[in-house]
Amino acid sequence: MGILEKKTAGPGGAARKTTTRAAGMAAEDRALAHLQAAGLRLLARNYRTPGRGGGEIDLILRDRDGTLVFVEVRSRASDAYGGAGASIGAAKRRRIVFAARHYLLRWPSPPPCRFDAVLVSGDAVQWLQAAFDAG
């Protein structure tokens, strides 16, 4: 058994990974419903750059004013360790910006853009508009 297998093996290893993925998808579903109720229109979900070392954007939407909104969805069962928002560090933001720039290559004249975060914690959904910038 290799090192990677040892890290995921054990009680509930595979089941935990599936449960975590399902919880993440459920949080994205809740975030999307919240944003659509606010008038945003979905353009892409789980957009990934090709190759290794790229980035992923959970949701890409268009706001009513035409702004392209790149959304990172974070979910935590509790507010321990800073809650959901604390998990969007500098490296994660760089990967999101990298993926956004890749996505924008398809636009002949890119619209204004914004980077939002939606934090899902328990029953609460918190939408942080302009949570960070591309700089």
Curated annotation (Swiss-Prot):
GO molecular function terms noted in the UniProt entry: nucleic acid binding
Pfam families reported in the protein's UniProt record: UPF0102
Matching InterPro entries: Restrct_endonuc-II-like (IPR011335), tRNA_endonuc-like_dom_sf (IPR011856), UPF0102_YraN-like (IPR003509)
Region (Disordered), start-end ranges: 1-21
Entry-linked PANTHER family: UPF0102 PROTEIN YRAN (PTHR34039:SF1)
Family: Belongs to the UPF0102 family.
Name this protein carries in UniProt: UPF0102 protein Aave_0630
Protein source organism: Paracidovorax citrulli (strain AAC00-1)
